[in-house]
Every structure is written in C-alpha cells, then in structure tokens.
Amino acid sequence: MKGVDDAFLGVGDKPGLDIWCIMGSNLIAIEKSLHGKFYTGNTYIILSTVELKSGVRQHNVHYWVGEEAKEEDCLTASDKAIELDVALGSNTVQYRETQGEESDKFLSYFKPCIIPIQGSLSSHMRIYGDKSKDTTMFRCEGEHVARVTEVPFSRSSLDHKAVFVVDTESKIFLFSGCNSSMQTRAKALDVVKHLKENRHCGRCEIATIEDGKLVGDSDAGDFWNLFGGYAPIPRDVQDTVMTELMTTSSKKLFWINKRNLVPVETNLLEREMLNSDRNYILDCGTEVFLWMGMTTLVSERRTSVTALEDYVRCEGRQSNARSVILTEGHETVEFKMHFQHWPKNAVPKLYEAGREKVAAIFKHQGYDVTEIPEDKPRHFISCNGSLKVWLVDNGSVTLLCTEEQEQLYNGDCYIIRYSYIEDGKDYHLFFAWSGLNSINEDRVAAASLMSGMIDSVKGHAVVAQVFEGREPEMFFLVFKSLIIFKGGRSMAYKNFVSQRSDANGWYQKNGVALFRVQGLKHDCIRAIQVDLAASSLNSSHCYILQAGGSFFTWLGSLSSPSDHNLLDRMMDKLCPLKQSLLVREGSEPDRFWEALGGRSEYLREKQVKDWPADPHLYTCHFEQGLFKAKEVFSFSQDDLVTEEILILDCVEELHIWVGHQSGVLSKEQALDIGKMFLQAGIHQDGRRPIDTTMYIVTEGDEPRFFTSFFNWDYSKQTMLGNSFERKLAILKGISQKLETPERSLRKSSSSSLPRRSPGTSSSEPTTPEQRAAARTFASASTGKLLRERSPAALSPSLSTPSPSPRSRSSASSSPASWNSTPSTVARRLFPPSLHASAEAVATGTPRRR
C-alpha cells in the first residue's frame, strides 16, 4: 500500500496486541513475550484489535512516549500512527500516551501493571528484566488499573493519599497512606505479587504497613529503619491544576487551517458544526480531541496532528491533558457526549447479513434450504423451577392461581417470583413487571412490596425491574407460555379509566381483539394484544384475530415455519375448542379487513435482529453530589470489589452489582442508581429509556446468567473481609473460613457492629471514604424515577391524591419531591407503610377473579 510502512501490512486481522518500537525512521516489532516492557528512552506504537460480537473488528492505536524519548521519535510515532490508521481503513481511534499519565484503557492491556525500565532499547539487545538487587520504591495509584511510578527511595516521597511499594533484596513492603482507598491498596497488592514473581522468583517475604500504625508492629519498625527511623509525613497538598481542569465546564472548538487554529464561537456544540472537509480540535479540559473529516487528505491529517501537539504544548498541558484522535464516523462515546443531540450511527447488520449469505451459498450449491436455523439463546437459568405471580392492587398483593398466572394485563403491575435450584443452591428471581398502561401508584408499590418479599425467602435472591415491551428473553422463559391482554384489574387502574371514561380496547372474551404471537421455538411462547387496526400488522410476524366467535390466524410473508408452529400452539392456549381460519398475507378475505376496521399500510420490510451487544462494566460513585460512572476496561471478576457498586451494561439490560461494603442500604437505592446511569446516557448515543430492564445482584448471590460474563471463580465468591484483606489472604496463602455473610441489603443496613480497623474483617465501613459513601448512597435520589409515558402523569387526580393516612405517609416519596442530585438529608425512597405490609401479604392465598 502506497504511503504505508511495510510493518503495518496485514496487521489487525486477529484479536490481540501488536507493538512496535520507534528506531529512528524504522519500526522494530516487539515479540509477544516482551509486551508490557517499555523503556523510558523510547517511543512505541501499540495496536489493540478486538472482535465484537457483531463480527466487526475494533481498532485502537496508542503511541506511548517515554519521559526520556527523543523529540524526533515522538514526531515519527505520530506520523506512523496516521499510516497505521490508513492501513486499517481510517477507522481507528488514536491515543497519545505519556509515561506516568497513561489512560485506563491503555493500562488495562498490560495487567497487573507496567513498570518502565530506565534507558533505551536498541535493535541489537533483548530484554531479560531488571536483575538489580538495589532497593527500589514505587508509588501506586488507581483502583481498577495500577498506575505505577518509580520514585526516589526517600522518606520525602511518601504521602498520605497513595500506596507505596518498597522492594528490597529479601522483603517487599507495602505502605498504605491513611487517605488511600481500600481498592487502591488491594490493587497495589497485584504490583507486589508481580514483583515477587518476576524479581524474586516467588521467594521473598511480604509486609504490609499502615500509615500511622507503629505500636507492636515489627514490620513497621523494619520499614522505618530503611529510612533511618520514623518521622511524620507532611500533610497532602491538593493538585490545584488538575482540580481546575476537572471542574471547568467551558469547551473550546477550533477548526484547523494550515496549522492555524480558528475559534468556532458557540455556546452549545452541535454535530452540524463539524464539516467533513475540515479537521477540528475540541478542548474539554482533561481531554483534547482531534476530529478529522472523512474527506480530508492524509497530508492534512498529519498537519492537524502537529497542530494538536503544538496546542497542547503551548498550553503547558502535556502531562495532564490526554490527546485523542478520531475520524468522522468512528467517534467515541466520550467525544459525542460533549455535543447536543448527536445522531445515532446507522451500522450494518452484519449478524443477519452473514446468515443470509450462508443461505445463498447453500442454495447455489443445490441444497433445499428453506430456513437457516436461528441461534438458540444461551439459557443460564433452570427451566424446571416453580413460578408464583402476585397482582399489585391498592398497596397490597394478591397471589394468582395457577390458571391465571400466565395471563397478565397491561394496565396492572405484577410481582413474579421464580424459584429454582442451581449448583445445589436455592435461587429466587423476582420480577416487578409494569404494564404499558399501568399507573405510577402501582409501580411504586410493586418495587417496594417486592423488596419486602425478599426477606421471606431462603437462598439467593436476585431482583429485576421490567416494563412491558422491554422484557428480556429470560422473563418469558420463566413463564413458558404467556398472554398479555389489554385492560386491568387493579382498583387504581379502574378508577383511572373511569375518570377518563376510556375503556376502549379492553379484552372481552367474545369481543374483537388482535394478538401478535412470538416466541423462542419450544422454550417459550407469548401472545400480546395489540391495537385493533391493520397498521398493527407486520410481515415478519404471525397474528391471531379474534372476531366474536370466529378466529383468523394470519401468516406474515416474512415469517418462518417455526413462527407458524408457535401460532398453532398459542391457538390451543387462547381458544382450545375453536377452529381458526388460516390466512396468508396477500390473500385475506374481506371480513378479515372488516374486523380490523379496514385496510391500511403496515410494516412490510424484514425485521433483522441486532447482534448481541458487547458488555461494558462501570464503577459508580458520587463526586461533589453528582453521579459519576467510569468504565472498567478488560474487566474480570477481581474488578467486583466489595466496597463498590458496579453496573454491567448489556445495552438492552443492566446488571447492578452491589458490594457488601458499598454503602448501598437497599435494593430500591440500587435501582435508583441504575436510573441515574440511564439518564446520564453513558456508553450510548444519548439517554436510554428509563424502562430498560435492571437486575439487582448482591455480592454472594450472583446467578449463572451474571457470572457467565466473567471467568468465574466460586471460591472468591464466599471470601470475607474487605478487598484488601481478601487479596492479601490469597497472596500469603492464608485459607479463610468461608462463610456466607448476610445477603439482605436492608438487613445489613441495620447492623450495629462496632467500627473496626482495616486489619479486621467486618462489613462495617472502616475508612473515611467508605463511611462517606454510605452517607452519600443513603441520601442519593434519582429525580424522576417513574416512566414519563405512564398514563397517570396525565391525570392530576392521581398524581395528587385526596388526603388520607396512607396518601399522607407516601407524600414525601412522590416524584415531585425527589431531586436530581443527592441531598444532605437521608430520605426513604419509598413509603415505609408499603415495606411493612409486604411480608404480611407475600404468602396470601390465591384469589380467583
């Protein structure tokens, strides 16, 4: 390829890393066994290739600059990164990484850590590792990736906010500053393990020192003797430069005209401001983006990269502002979030396109292929469990009989409990299902009553909040057969309808109704009543039309034979004694259209299935009263630390994992944090619907459908203590007594255990930031928790009920009283009366309606 280095030809075809070192104008490929070993006097280019579930390859290019690297090597690296982008079709994202200020994404490639080696690499030498026996000292920061910096071996290098590792000939000391988080201390133990295995061949002692702890600790005495005796450490000084960059809200946009920056005057950033024939610089404080239009020349892009580096250098921010270079059409979420209403990308449906190509090949070779078998979903839940369904009505629940639990109404809310045995353990999966037309009062009651039911079961409980139209496949799996009718049976919904005098569309046994039939072959089947109109039809689906005493089964022209089989099975469920008239699309009789109110246009195009989304893990916290979420790259089970709450984002559903020491006091609060995450629009092109399915998974209660996202080690699931104590026990080979701690969030919140030091095992908050987290999560609220599309929002009489003891007790929990940011006063998110009544009615007797 013209203008591209030969070293880049054919790269990026396989997932993994490719690394080159800049040697003058040449590129020296680094073999796999030496990945992660960087010299301070060199510059490197790193290509990360990831194959997404869609089959698309994602490329990230990083060029790493050592603190002693030559200026000409840095310029060569930026030019070579542009060449690599061209070789890969101009669809990469490029990051400039400076030694000591690397991004979390970059550091995640080289877990547990990278420790740059002094000097430079020549093309005639090999790296055998640092064999020096001299005492070295490292500063460790970071909670999910270790940010390691070698510092002078001196007492003056110590401070209270970081963790330090001192590596001597016979012993490795870990010193934890009193203001360091438990997660940082635990992550620093990974560095200790790395040094022990690579510098000491696994043979050395490990000592942990706590800042300020001296009495009766021989290891502390040995540690301070290295520095000539103990002396107080000065107080930490705040980094005002970084704080100013992080708190600034102003953004600067420039377009590049022959290395000159021309400001774009605007108050709000819009996508339309970026022209495809220009390159732009967007300065966002801690990050500086270079956006390159798709029609710009390679020479213009190289000039723009130089302009970017000049800009950062002139601003004096080489060390604290990260440069990100991207091409039009391949923008990162972090970049798009700075703009108002960024349009969603129209990406090709490679998942379905590949299946169609396979079918075409078989047909060309003479095979009679009527249908390529669809991918069977992975079931990480037993389908042989027991099901119970409760109707939420007037602040209480009523257990439905077996015949009725497979018939839901879209004006009601239900609590579903599915109990099953997995690996010899009892699991209970709770769903709070809200119908499309259900009212806010029932929705709030369902979430609260479900939390009360959890305490009445033994075993491992997982909670899910589900809304009609957004249900996960697992919801339908537990039913196996389900019919959703229009209408409702709760008193609140009936009152709402009577006030509006609108009961049209309610299902009547001998009336007229249209049902869309879908399913997963023999695993589960569902029929959903839709609007009685021809516009509700879809060529990709099958339908049942009930017209009084007559039934039609309508086959869409794009539906499959398996869909037709599901249709026959649903007819047996819906009307077992009736014979239906089979109607194929395009040959409908007149009375079919008459029952639908006449002909009209409907969707006739093939509905292709999106590929499974790649999961992303985020850690959540509050910063100055504002909700923050940060992605954890290359995540593993070890990233689920007990002091945190993490969200596994699978796009169509969220798994909210709650650690025992996270400070989250109830499952309602965990749902509240999930809604904050959705409203923030993290990882997506704008905000997602608030009715996205959310699972609440408590530490120790992880079901298989959650652990399947990780390479799960069940022995870690039952360990006690904080994250530092657990990792230290593994490192020292100490076998813990494995017990099952209290799983209920609400029960653990009432614990009155005395406060303990970090060296003892307890779920009580032990550090200042843990206690602050507990206070923060206790007072956090979402703002608008309930869906805006609920019909109750349209009815003033329901949003402001008449005074009564019950309504007065729940007034403080109304949506109008919730703020968008945490307040200093803790408040209950749901009415306490609902919590109190839940256990009393959870085991009620079935009632037939």
Curated annotation (Swiss-Prot):
Spans annotated as Disordered: 739-849
GO terms for biological process, alphabetical: actin filament capping; actin filament organization
Keyword Cytoplasm: yes
Tissue: Expressed in roots, young leaves, and inflorescences, mostly in the vasculature of roots, leaves, and filaments of the anthers. Also detected in guard cells.
Keyword tags: Actin capping, Actin-binding, Calcium, Cytoplasm, Cytoskeleton, Repeat
Predominant place of localization: cytoplasm
Record's keyword annotation contains Transmembrane helix: no
Bias (Low complexity) ranges: 747-782, 791-823
Subcellular location: Cytoplasm, Cytoskeleton
Signal peptide: none
Gelsolin-like repeat start and end residues: 30-107, 147-213, 262-335, 405-475, 527-566
Gene Ontology CC: actin filament bundle; cytoplasm
An example molecular function term from Gene Ontology annotations: actin filament binding
Functional description taken from the UniProt entry: Ca(2+)-independent actin-binding protein. Binds actin microfilaments (MFs). Involved in actin filament bundling, severing and capping. Caps the barbed end of actin filaments and protects them from disassembly. Promotes VLN3-mediated MF severing.
Name of the protein this chain belongs to: Villin-1
Source organism of the structure: Oryza sativa subsp. japonica (Rice)
